C-alpha cells in the first residue's frame, strides 16, 4: 500500500484495479474447488431472504428455533424458488452443538428430523447435493450418534453415482466406530466387569482395505485416528500399538520417522488426542503419554496443551478399571498435573484441567493432593499474568478464589486439627495473588 501511495493517481488506480481483479479471480476458483460444483452449475452466494433468515436463526445456536422457522417456511411453500446454493447453505447450517457433548435426546431427534426434511424437500424440487453435503450429514450423524441415517446416505450416494472422497469415507468410519469425544459414553472393556458391545473395528478395517482402493483413494491421518477409536472400543490394545508402530514408526522400545511432512498420513495434534483417548479408554494412560510424547518429538510437533485435558480425564476415569491398583493411579494423576504445570508454567492455564482434578480429590478426600493441585494452579496463574488480558485475569482470579475458599471450608469440616495452618497459608496465598494482579487484597 505504501508503494501504491507513492504512485501518480492514474497509475495507482489502474494498478489497484488489476490487483482486485486478480484477487476476485482467485476467490472464484477457490469457491469452485470448495463446493465441487459441476461446470453447468457455478456457485452463487446465497442471497435469498428465506435462506438468509434461516442462517441468521441457526447462528443463535438453538436447534428448536431453526426447526420452527424451517417448518413455517415449508408450510408456506416458500422453498420452491430456492437455488441449490441456498439449500446447501441451509443444510450446512444444521450442526450438532458442542460436537455432541452432553447433547439432549430432544436435540438429537431435532437434528435428525431437520436433515430428513431438507433431503425430502431437495428431492421434491430436484436439487442435487454433492459429496461435501453428504459428508456434512454423516459428520452430524457421527456427533449425534445416529447410525440409522448412515445406510440411507450410503445408498443415496451409490444410487446417484456420486464419487466418494476420503473425507466421506472418514465420516462413515466415525459413524461406525464413534470418535474420541464419544468414548466416554461407552463402557470400557477395562471396566470391572465384562461389557458386551458390538464389534466395530472389523467393519472399519474392511472399508479401509476394500472401499478406499476401489476408488483409488489413500487413507490419511484422520482415517487412522478413527480406526484407533474403533479398536479401542473393541478392547484391541495390542492392535493399537501395532497400528502406531506400522503407520508412524513409534513403539514402546524405539522410534523412527516413517512419514515425511508432505504425506497425507503425517501426524497432527488430532493424532495425539486420538492416541491418548484410545489408550486411556483402555486404562493404559502411562503408555498413552509416553507414545504421544515420542510421536511429537520424532515428528517435531508441539505437544498440544489441550492433550493434558484428555490425559487428566482418562487418568481419573481409569480408576474404575481393572489393574493396576487405584493408589498408583492417583499418583499418576499427581505426576501428570505436575508435568502439565511445569511444561506450560508461562502459558495461560486451562481451567478445566485443575477444576476436574480438584473435584475428584475432594470427592475422594485426598486433601494433600488437593493442596498440591491448588499450588500448581496458583504458580501457573502467577507465571502467566503478562500473557493474560484483563478479562481472562478476572475470570481466572474468580475461579481460583472460589476453589481456595472451598479448600479452606473443606479443611474446617474434614480436618479441624489442621484448620489454622490451612487458613494462614491460603490467606497469604490469596494476598499474594491480589498484590500480583494489582487488585487490593480483601480484608
Swiss-Prot record:
Which residues fall in a coiled-coil region? Answer: none
Per UniProt, subcellular location reads as: Mitochondrion
Q: Where is the transit peptide?
A: 1-13
PPR repeat intervals: 130-164, 220-254
- Which GO MF terms are attached to this record? mRNA binding
InterPro entries named among the record's database cross-references: ATPase_expression_mit, Pentatricopeptide_rpt, TPR-like_helical_dom_sf
Upon gene disruption, the observed phenotype is: Impairs growth on galactose, leads to low viability on glucose containing G418, and leads to strongly sensitivity to antimycin A on glucose medium.
Could you tell me the superkingdom of the organism this chain comes from? Eukaryota
According to its UniProt entry, one GO biological process term is:
mitochondrial gene expression
GO CC: one term? mitochondrion
Q: Keywords for this entry?
A: Mitochondrion, Repeat, Transit peptide
Function, as annotated: Mitochondrial RNA-binding protein required for the stability of the atp9 mRNA.
Q: What is this protein called?
A: Pentatricopeptide repeat-containing protein 6, mitochondrial
Q: Which gene encodes it?
A: ppr6
Amino acid at each position: 500500500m505504501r508503494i501504491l501511495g507513492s504512485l501518480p493517481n492514474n497509475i495507482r488506480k489502474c494498478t489497484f484495479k488489476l490487483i482486485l481483479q486478480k484477487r476476485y479471480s482467485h476467490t472464484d476458483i477457490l469457491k469452485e474447488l470448495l463446493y465441487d460444483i459441476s461446470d453447468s452449475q457455478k456457485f452463487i452466494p446465497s442471497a435469498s431472504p428465506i435462506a438468509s433468515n434461516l442462517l441468521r436463526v441457526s447462528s443463535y445456536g438453538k436447534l428448536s428455533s431453526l426447526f420452527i422457522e424451517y417448518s413455517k417456511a415449508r408450510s408456506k411453500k416458500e422453498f420452491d424458488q430456492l437455488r441449490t446454493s441456498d439449500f446447501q447453505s441451509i443444510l450446512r447450517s444444521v450442526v450438532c452443538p458442542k460436537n455432541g457433548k452432553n447433547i439432549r435426546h430432544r436435540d438429537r431427534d431435532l437434528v435428525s428430523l431437520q436433515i430428513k426434511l431438507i433431503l425430502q424437500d431437495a428431492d421434491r424440487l430436484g436439487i442435487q447435493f454433492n459429496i461435501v453435503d453428504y459428508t456434512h450429514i454423516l459428520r452430524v450423524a457421527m456427533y449425534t450418534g445416529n447410525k440409522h441415517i448412515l445406510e440411507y446416505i450410503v445408498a443415496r450416494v451409490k444410487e446417484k453415482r456420486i464419487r466418494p472422497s476420503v473425507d466421506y469415507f472418514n465420516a462413515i468410519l466415525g459413524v461406525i466406530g464413534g470418535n474420541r469425544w464419544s468414548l466416554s459414553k461407552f463402557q470400557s472393556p477395562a471396566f470391572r466387569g465384562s461389557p458386551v458391545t458390538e464389534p466395530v473395528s472389523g467393519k472399519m478395517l474392511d472399508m479401509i482395505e476394500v472401499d478406499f482402493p476401489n476408488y483409488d483413494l489413500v487413507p490419511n491421518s484422520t482415517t487412522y485416528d478413527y480406526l484407533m477409536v474403533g479398536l479401542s472400543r473393541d478392547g484391541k490394545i495390542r492392535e493399537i500399538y501395532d497400528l502406531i508402530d506400522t503407520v508412524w514408526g513409534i513403539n514402546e522400545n524405539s522410534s523412527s520417522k516413517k512419514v515425511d511432512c508432505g504425506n497425507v498420513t503425517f501426524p497432527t495434534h488430532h493424532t495425539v488426542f486420538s492416541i491418548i483417548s484410545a489408550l486411556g479408554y483402555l486404562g493404559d494412560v502411562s503408555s498413552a503419554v509416553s507414545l504421544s510424547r515420542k510421536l511429537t518429538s520424532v515428528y517435531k510437533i508441539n505437544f498440544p496443551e489441550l492433550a493434558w485435558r484428555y490425559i487428566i480425564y482418562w487418568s481419573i476415569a481409569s480408576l474404575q478399571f481393572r489393574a493396576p491398583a487405584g493408589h498408583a493411579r492417583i499418583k499418576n494423576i499427581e505426576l501428570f498435573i505436575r508435568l502439565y504445570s511445569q511444561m506450560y508454567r508461562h502459558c495461560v492455564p486451562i481451567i478445566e484441567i485443575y477444576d476436574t482434578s480438584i473435584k475428584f480429590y475432594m470427592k475422594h478426600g485426598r486433601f494433600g493432593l488437593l493442596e498440591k493441585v491448588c499450588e500448581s494452579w496458583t504458580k501457573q496463574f502467577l507465571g502467566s499474568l503478562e500473557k493474560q488480558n484483563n478479562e481472562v485475569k478476572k475470570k481466572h482470579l474468580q475461579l481460583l478464589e472460589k476453589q481456595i475458599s472451598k479448600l479452606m471450608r473443606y479443611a474446617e469440616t474434614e480436618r479441624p486439627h489442621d484448620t489454622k495452618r490451612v487458613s494462614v497459608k491460603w490467606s497469604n496465598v490469596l494476598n499474594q495473588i491480589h498484590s500480583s494482579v494489582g487488585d487490593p487484597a480483601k480484608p
